[in-house]
From Swiss-Prot:
Name the record gives this protein: A-factor type gamma-butyrolactone 1'-reductase (1S-forming)
Top-level taxon in the UniProt lineage: Bacteria
Reported consequences of knocking out the gene: Deletion mutant cannot produce VB or virginiamycin.
Protein EC: 1.1.1.413
Reactions performed catalytically: a (3R,4R)-3-[(1S)-1-hydroxyalkyl]-4-(hydroxymethyl)oxolan-2-one + NADP(+) = a (3R,4R)-3-alkanoyl-4-(hydroxymethyl)oxolan-2-one + NADPH + H(+)
């Protein structure tokens, strides 16, 4: 038998929000599956350490510091990827910001604006240069946006977070329809409760939340970032070659009840 070829062998991937949580798990998995990866986030020290770790394992990896809520930063991240590796084949857009459980009628405008800028504008800013790069290469590509179960049902978080994650699904279906004929696939993942810095903070502020969520989930536990990363890697691979405009729910069954 020959060695198994990685899902993403010889592909060039850009991963945003890669300094922690799902994004950090993603860069490791993509590299192990054979991709050259460019990781981006706001924390340079964390990114540099992640890239050093990947290179020590024999992966092709680079990083660029960027805040994708700024359109020029998103453009720069894509341009860096193309300059460094020659093209862009796959992109994983992951930015997430919530606001605890602040009641809607008590929420200030800046909180709403911050959530929408991070969760929606950040995806929009990434999609434009990513799609442009894939069109320029003529080889198509695959983009995966990160929504959440909050994009499917009303979850026990602030209303603007639910709104923003529904919007991400629109930013998935629209481009999927518009660019499918160009060989560009756009899908979304909708993770359930997943261990990350943000979720850990939320659990700390709401001590009973994790147990309550487990009771409402057929698989009564919190997902590990690696489990979410596996779903996104499949969507970015040619094994999902006829999948576009879809949302892959990775929530242990939370939304089926």
């Amino acid at each position: 038998m020959t060695d198994r070829q990685g899902l993403l062998t010889d592909r060039i991937a850009l991963i945003t929000g890669a300094s922690s949580g799902i994004g950090a798990a993603q860069r490791g998995l993509f590299a192990r599956e054979g991709a050259a990866v460019v990781v981006t986030a706001r924390r340079e020290e964390r990114l540099a350490g992640l890239v050093d770790e990947l290179r020590a394992q024999g992966a092709r990896a680079a990083y660029v510091v960027a805040d994708v809520t700024r359109s020029e930063d998103a453009v720069r991240a894509v341009e860096f990827t193309v300059e460094r590796f020659g093209r862009l084949d796959a992109a994983f857009n992951k930015r997430r910001h919530g606001a605890g459980r602040t009641p809607l009628h008590l929420m200030d405008d800046p909180v709403y604006d911050d959530i929408m800028d991070t969760n929606v504008r950040g995806v929009f800013n990434c999609l434009r240069p990513e799609i442009a790069a894939m069109l320029a290469s003529g080889a198509g590509g695959s983009i995966v946006n990160t929504s959440s179960t909050g994009g499917l049902v009303a979850t026990p978080v602030a209303a603007p977070y639910v709104v923003s994650k529904h919007a991400v699904l629109g930013l998935t279906k629209g481009p999927a329809a518009e660019y499918g004929a160009h060989g560009i696939r756009v899908n979304a993942i909708a993770p359930g409760t997943t261990r990350s810095e943000m979720v850990a903070d939320w659990f700390a502020q709401n001590p009973d939340a994790e147990e309550l969520l487990h009771r409402a989930t057929p698989q009564p536990r919190t997902a590990e970032p690696q489990e979410i990363a596996e779903a996104a890697a499949w969507l970015c691979s040619e094994r999902a070659s006829f999948v576009t405009g879809s949302t892959l729910v990775v929530d242990g069954g939370f939304t089926i009840l």
